[in-house]
Amino acid sequence: MIKIQPEEISSVIRKQIEQYNQEVKVVNTGTVLQVGDGIARIYGLAKAMAGELLEFEDGTVGIALNLESNNVGAVLMGDGFSIQEGSRVKATGKIAQIPIGESYIGRVVDALARPIDGKGDIPSSETRLIESPAPGIISRRSVYEPLQTGLVSVDAMIPIGRGQRELIIGDRQTGKTAVAIDTILNQKGQNVICVYVAIGQKASSVAQVVSTLEENGAMAYTIIVAENANAPATLQYLAPYTGATLAEFFMYSGRHTLVIYDDLSKQAQAYREMSLLLRRPPGREAYPGDVFYLHSRLLERAAKLSNALGEGSMTALPIIETQAGDVAAYIPTNVISITDGQIFLSADLFNSGIRPAINVGISVSRVGSAAQIKAMKQVAGKLKLELAQFAELEAFAQFASDLDKATQNQLARGRRLRELLKQAQSSPLPVAQQVLTIYAGVNGYLDSIAIEDVKKFLAGLRNYVITSKAAIINNINSSKAVTPETEGMMKEAINEYKKVFAAGA
């Protein structure tokens, strides 16, 4: 029989007492009362914060949105099929944040910045809150630099500046995404980081956008955030904030960024779904009362930063889909009032072959000519006036039988100017070529060209100037203005090419 040594036992006990750790880890936990439709009701969690991340037993993460007297309503960032009534929930003490960094450029990620393009993990050492506060008044300066879209009708008449919020609004299938993608393509070589956020889109549509950007070499400066139509409402609601957060990283490091939200109507619908399931009181069109705040806090994050903060910028192009052209519906009017102007795309113009189908009459930029180079200001003012007069005359001419010669000439020029604004998809024009094109139109050089030949003539003219008269393009690019010398060279080049075109025709 083994003899027990009391000294040994006492030394073991003493050692264990010395090593005993008195620290107590307090964890805020709760119990699932009810789960379904992407919503969980939790008993307990008395100290939960609004917007705090919650961790369920199966690893699913949720966000505490409703803090009620006897339970917490949380939205799930996953399907939550393996969460059961009575399972434990742990409050993490954290607010939703995502990793950020340079390595995200060229990648496709989801609303939690996790890669979904099959190209492996994204290395990152920094994180940023998804819901970051917008820059204050002192942190900003007024918009003064142009952000060229490459579309003649936008850059000439509805100019967008770096740091502006310009809404793209129109019915389905009117080319809203095409305008946004062309703007991304036109940022090549401009040192602008683009973020395209796809909310509730078909996976095939997102794949098409990715392939268009890859074919044109635009993925080298673009990040895509995608939450498809089959994603939980919570992730569709978060996706735009994730896009803004990724762009903010570059903005605060003194870079220029462009963010496209395609589209915010679907984000509002996802938020409505979440709110109704959380039993929040419905308002107009069954949207919750804070749906305006949903969009305003997102779009206010777009800014042109002050010199002290490095003069970075975030330009936002939110997209809104209307039903049968109704811009007076709830969400469209909300976003129109938040943004600095809107580009209105018309189904009638689209169907009549005018593409991009931009209705110049009701589209507006509230930044205006501050976001244009001098050369564009010199030629674009006349273009807008001529088109406005043409629209008025065209409506009148439908009822008048005999028109005088001056009116006929004005109508003929208006039709040619309308032709000048047509552009093929994925073929944005550099600003110097736009100036040349508009100059030819407003100064009557197209009046003798048949309407059906205008596009062919302008394409040939641009090609002729690039190959034979490159000094014109170089002068406009360097001086950002049409000097008398450049104007003389433009007149000469247009007249020379007209002879070449007439001989070829």
Swiss-Prot record:
<keyword id="KW-0150">Chloroplast</keyword>
<dbReference type="GO" id="GO:0043531">
    <property type="term" value="F:ADP binding"/>
</dbReference>
<keyword id="KW-0067">ATP-binding</keyword>
<keyword id="KW-1278">Translocase</keyword>
<keyword id="KW-0547">Nucleotide-binding</keyword>
<dbReference type="InterPro" id="IPR027417">
    <property type="entry name" value="P-loop_NTPase"/>
</dbReference>
<comment type="similarity">
    <text>Belongs to the ATPase alpha/beta chains family.</text>
</comment>
<keyword id="KW-0139">CF(1)</keyword>
<keyword id="KW-0793">Thylakoid</keyword>
<keyword id="KW-0934">Plastid</keyword>
<feature type="site" description="Required for activity">
    <location>
        <position position="363"/>
    </location>
</feature>
<dbReference type="InterPro" id="IPR000793">
    <property type="entry name" value="ATP_synth_asu_C"/>
</dbReference>
<dbReference type="GO" id="GO:0045259">
    <property type="term" value="C:proton-transporting ATP synthase complex"/>
</dbReference>
<dbReference type="InterPro" id="IPR004100">
    <property type="entry name" value="ATPase_F1/V1/A1_a/bsu_N"/>
</dbReference>
<comment type="function">
    <text>Produces ATP from ADP in the presence of a proton gradient across the membrane. The alpha chain is a regulatory subunit.</text>
</comment>
<keyword id="KW-0406">Ion transport</keyword>
<dbReference type="InterPro" id="IPR000194">
    <property type="entry name" value="ATPase_F1/V1/A1_a/bsu_nucl-bd"/>
</dbReference>
<keyword id="KW-0813">Transport</keyword>
<keyword id="KW-0375">Hydrogen ion transport</keyword>
<dbReference type="InterPro" id="IPR020003">
    <property type="entry name" value="ATPase_a/bsu_AS"/>
</dbReference>
<dbReference type="InterPro" id="IPR038376">
    <property type="entry name" value="ATP_synth_asu_C_sf"/>
</dbReference>
<protein>
    <recommendedName>
        <fullName>ATP synthase subunit alpha, chloroplastic</fullName>
        <ecNumber>7.1.2.2</ecNumber>
    </recommendedName>
</protein>
<dbReference type="Pfam" id="PF00306">
    <property type="entry name" value="ATP-synt_ab_C"/>
</dbReference>
<dbReference type="InterPro" id="IPR036121">
    <property type="entry name" value="ATPase_F1/V1/A1_a/bsu_N_sf"/>
</dbReference>
<dbReference type="GO" id="GO:0009535">
    <property type="term" value="C:chloroplast thylakoid membrane"/>
</dbReference>
<dbReference type="Pfam" id="PF00006">
    <property type="entry name" value="ATP-synt_ab"/>
</dbReference>
<dbReference type="InterPro" id="IPR033732">
    <property type="entry name" value="ATP_synth_F1_a_nt-bd_dom"/>
</dbReference>
<dbReference type="InterPro" id="IPR005294">
    <property type="entry name" value="ATP_synth_F1_asu"/>
</dbReference>
<comment type="subunit">
    <text>F-type ATPases have 2 components, CF(1) - the catalytic core - and CF(0) - the membrane proton channel. CF(1) has five subunits: alpha(3), beta(3), gamma(1), delta(1), epsilon(1). CF(0) has four main subunits: a, b, b' and c.</text>
</comment>
<dbReference type="GO" id="GO:0046933">
    <property type="term" value="F:proton-transporting ATP synthase activity, rotational mechanism"/>
</dbReference>
<dbReference type="Pfam" id="PF02874">
    <property type="entry name" value="ATP-synt_ab_N"/>
</dbReference>
<keyword id="KW-0472">Membrane</keyword>
<keyword id="KW-0066">ATP synthesis</keyword>
<dbReference type="InterPro" id="IPR023366">
    <property type="entry name" value="ATP_synth_asu-like_sf"/>
</dbReference>
<dbReference type="GO" id="GO:0005524">
    <property type="term" value="F:ATP binding"/>
</dbReference>
<feature type="binding site">
    <location>
        <begin position="170"/>
        <end position="177"/>
    </location>
    <ligand>
        <name>ATP</name>
    </ligand>
</feature>
